[in-house]
Every structure is written in C-alpha cells, then in structure tokens.
Amino acid sequence: MKFEYHVKPTGNDAACGDTEHPFATISKAAQMASPGDTVIVHEGVYREQVDPRRGGLSEHERITYCGAEGEARPVIKGSECVQGWTELADHPHVWTVVLDNTMFGDFNPFATPIFGDWLEMPKFGEDPDKHLGDVYLNGVSFFESTTLEGVYDPQPRDTDEDFALKIPCPVPDVDRTRYVWHAEVDENAGTTTIWANFQGADPNEELVEVSVRRTCFFPSRNHVNYITVRGFEMAQATGDWAPPTSQQWGMIGPNWSYGWIIEDNVLHDAKFSAVSLGKEISSGDNEWAKTERKTGYQYQLEAVFKARRIGWEKGLIGGHIVRNNDIYECGQNAIVGHMGSAFCRIEHNHVHHIALKREFFGWEVAGIKFHAALDTVIANNNIHDCSLGMWMDWQTQGTRITRNVFHDNVRDLMIEVSHGPYLVDNNVFASPVMFQNWSQGGAFVNNLICGGIEPHTVPDRSTPYHYPHTTEVAGCAVVSGGDERWLNNMFAPQPVKPTVGEYGLSAYSDCPMSMHEYLERQRAMWADPSQGGGERNPLQSLYAGGNIYLSGAQGLNKQEGAADDSERMQEDASFFGGTASTSVACDEPMPVTLVEEPDGLYLQCIVPQAVADTRMQVVTSDMLGVPRIVEERYEQPDGSDYVLDTDLLGQALTATERKAGALNGLVSGENHIRIWEWNN
C-alpha cells in the first residue's frame, strides 16, 4: 500500500504525517517512507540533515521526495542562524560571537581543516589551515582569514590567480572580498569563537548564518536505491574536499547507491560540491595525504579494483539522473563523482559560478568533475563562469558529451588519462580555452569551437580501460597522444587570444598521417637499442576531415587557411572506417557572441557565405572506427549505432549531409538563435 506523507514547519513529528497532521521535519518522514511512498514537503526552511532510512525497490517502486505543488520551494539548509553578536570597540564593523560546541554535534566545520589527496592550496604542512566552515550574511558567503588581524582591515581584491594556468582572473564582486571571518575553537571550554567583518551591517538585525551540517540530503549507508528528490532548494552545507580517493561528500547525493533522480532543484552555496555521485569510503580515504606510503595515482588505481570487490557493477552502482537543476556558487564542483557517476545521465542543468571564490584549490575543481564516467551521457547543459567547465578524468569510456553550451569559463573542457572511445558532439565551446587534452581515443564531431586546443601525452601514468558497457577491467595503458577523430567541426577563433593552446588542429601537426606511418615510427623506435626493453609509445595517428577553419585557425599542416585533411581518412579507411571528407578554409572571421535574454541564451554571429554553403557527410559509428588501445566501437550505451544527424537544438535531419559545426540552421549573414532555455 502506497502512502503520501506531508511535512510542514508547523507540523509535529509525533503526528501521523497525513495532510491534516503533517510532520515537522523531513527526517521524520524519511524514517517512515517505504518503497512506493511519496513525501510532500511544504514551503518553509528546514535546517536538518536528511538521512533516508530506506530506498525504493525498482524504477516503478521509488521513494519520492518533492516540494508541494503551487507553493514556494521548500529550503533545506546546512546552516543555523546566529545572533548575540558583539561589536569590537576598537575595530568598527568587526563583531564576535561565542558559540557552544553542542550546536555542532560531532562535526564542527570550524574545527575541521580542508585536507585530502590532490589538494594544492592550502598545502598541508606549508600553508596555514583553512576550514570547512563558512559565515553568511543575507545568504552571501564570506571569505576565511587565517589570522584575526586579517579580519580587522581586509583589503579588497580585484584579481585572483587561476591556480591551474597561473593567469590573473577578475574577481566577480570586488566589494565582497572585504567580508571576512576568522574562528578559533576551544575544545577544553567547549566553545567556538567567530570574528567577522560585516562592513557596517548589524548582524543582530540581519540574517546571519553559520555552517553546521556536512550535508542536506545524503544517506549514511550505501545501497539506498531508487530515490527521487524533486523541487527543493538546498544551500549552505559544507561537504568536504572530494578527491577520487576518498569518500566524496555532497550537499545531496546517493552515497554509493543506484537509480537516483535529482531533478528540478536549486542547489547553491555548497562549500565544496553540490551533488556527489561519488565513491564510498572503504575503497580509499585519503591514504596518500595521510601516509605518503604510495602516490595518489597508485591509491586511485587500487580504488578501482577495491570497488570492483565491493560490487561496482552496472545495475548495482550509478545509473543516476541529474536534470533540470540550477547549481551555482559552490567552491569545488556543481557535480562530482568517481565510479558512482557511471551509467548516468546529466541533462539540462544550469551550472555556473563554480570555484570563483578561489579560497582553495586542488586537481579536482570544475563545474562537473567525473572519474570513470563509463557510458554516462552529459547533454544539453549550460556551463559558464567556472574556473573549468568540465573535467573528465580516468576511464572516460563510452561517455558522450553532447549539445552543451560552454561560455565565459577560464577553460571549457579537460579530459585526462582516458583511452576512449568517447564522443564530444554538437557542443558550443565559446571560451578562450576550449580543450586541454591529456587523453586519447576521443571523437569530436560537429562542434562550434572558439577557443584554443592544447594536447599532451602522459607517459608516466598507466590507467584502466574496460570491456564494453561493463566495469570489468580489460587492461591499463599510458596516453601516447593522438588516436582521435576531428570531423565536421567549425573552428571560429575570436579576438581574445587563448592563454594556452592553438586555434584549430595545428597543435596535433606532429601526429602521424596514418596507421602505416605510426607503425613505421614504432618500428624505428624498436630498432634503437638505446631504448632498452621497455614500451615504445610514439604519437598516434589523428583523423580529421570535414572541418571548417575560419580566419585565425590553422589546419594540421600549421598553415592558416590550409585545411585539406582528407588524406588522413582515405589512407586509413580499413582501420578508421569512413570515407574521405575534405575540410574547408575560409579567410574571413566569424564573430560569436552569447547573450542572456529573458527567455534564454542566444548566440549571435555573422556567418560568411562560404561557411553557410558547406555540406558535410553525417557522421555515424561506422565512420569512427575503434580506438587503437580499447578496440571498442563508438556506440551508444545500449550498443546501438551513433547517427549524428541531430544538431545542438535537437533538430533532426532527413538528409545524409549537414553543415559543419553545432547549428545546422545557420544562414549567411547575421544570426540570432536561442541555443539554451529552461523548460518552464
């Protein structure tokens, strides 16, 4: 028998939970709900950490948590309100409050330093600690000062350094940098003292909140499956630094479960990650940072095999849907995951303003950061104003990144130590840096690319690949570089020079022209006795065709406007599949601007006639062949073929030809096209 439970702030947890007698907390309903039940949460603020006791049994017997129709979103907060502030007589605008540690329970974020594998700033043992806690004035978070003196006279900053690229980046809100806090925890006295500079505001008259809870909606146990969370606002949970070798906390997440749907929510101001589809703790808990016995790479490799031993399999872990969420103002990620992010669908989310406070940094920071996202589809998301839009790391296999819009990021996309096959198609990449590539085996088809491309090899890390559509490990390999397909893309450089990389495909010009040339290079390396008995890993072939190079973009031969890459397809047809498709050079520029309007995001551009007239063959799985190492077809998660006849806007074609780039409807001259909108 299916039940419908109701929750209202004015309710009573001793009640029965029906419409007339609602519970007061979501947590009470989460203890009662059984498979097939629905928990309807009415508008109001809920300061609690929801730990669902049970999951559903199947896709048809879920437990659903949803906001009440026709009401404002219910809000779950990881913070508590704080009053009783006292202003310092000798330091105007600086106020202090002493909190009893009992308000935090067994987790005090102001006593817990940021720590873990791949954390670079603050550097453990070198830099002063920073902490998981935060202070909020009317919903806006402050910055932590590592000294009390820094609270007395904070200096505004108009630029911060991007840690990865070492370039200056403008601060979005300069005045906000003067709002700072410092805390000291006295375990003997059982108190936490916070000092904060409110810049003239009276904290006893305003809404001031401090971090208390690590999560908002997160089961404490694994395998709490088939839960839907819809229509909430969640904010101000701390989470924790979330590398792939630790428990990956999120403001909301399934905690190593299967079949969750997280949809139609507003998720913001997580100190670290808003949504975690990540790893549990038994397969790794920051052992590199704790012991230094082995490297982080080795512990991460071990984590894959440990996870297999505890049930990392298709149908048991992952398989989540994250869609139609607005996610912003988070310190590390909007969405993070390792292995639990396999077999998922990440669709139509608005991901923005991620990691722009730059209070900390490590090699896990991006709007979306996944490891081992096997067969995961990331589609139709709007990703902007992030230090890095998307970072796919380790085992990007069977993954598809399609119909997304990237803009106003420091970097749009990074893919690391993966061997394919993965597909990046029908996206708009409008930031100055489109792609940092530390990987191989990708196919890039029908994208509009405005930024620079920078490829790398990775000879010192051998990472896993899998049998198709499973988590079973088939082998490990290093990244030799190349073995990629670049077909039907439109390279449209903008006036802003990329801080890294080159426009077009010229950065790949050292790749061999064919599989035959690759083998000749490898044989020459084996003939050199000075290299010993180790592996030989020369650059692999690159396959390109059907691309348009506008003014400023260079083809593989590094000559601007010289774009005939077809021989790479013709000579290698037996290995690569497909047929010849000649690229096109156009010596005219194509200015591209993205504009936010009330009804969505618009792309404005002036298209040269030569570009509008081009027609390229629709790309299919048969045209893409297989990556050299993995030997898996480029195909959909269910094993069916790709037929890339649908553009960014979802417009399917009936012909076998289409325009290069992501928009088949471009016309000569001025274009003003809505490329992303909310469903409602």
Tell me the role of every PLM-derived stretch.
Residues 271-273, 277-333, 338-367, 371-373:
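Hydrophobic, small-residue-rich alpha-helical packing segments that form membrane-like cores
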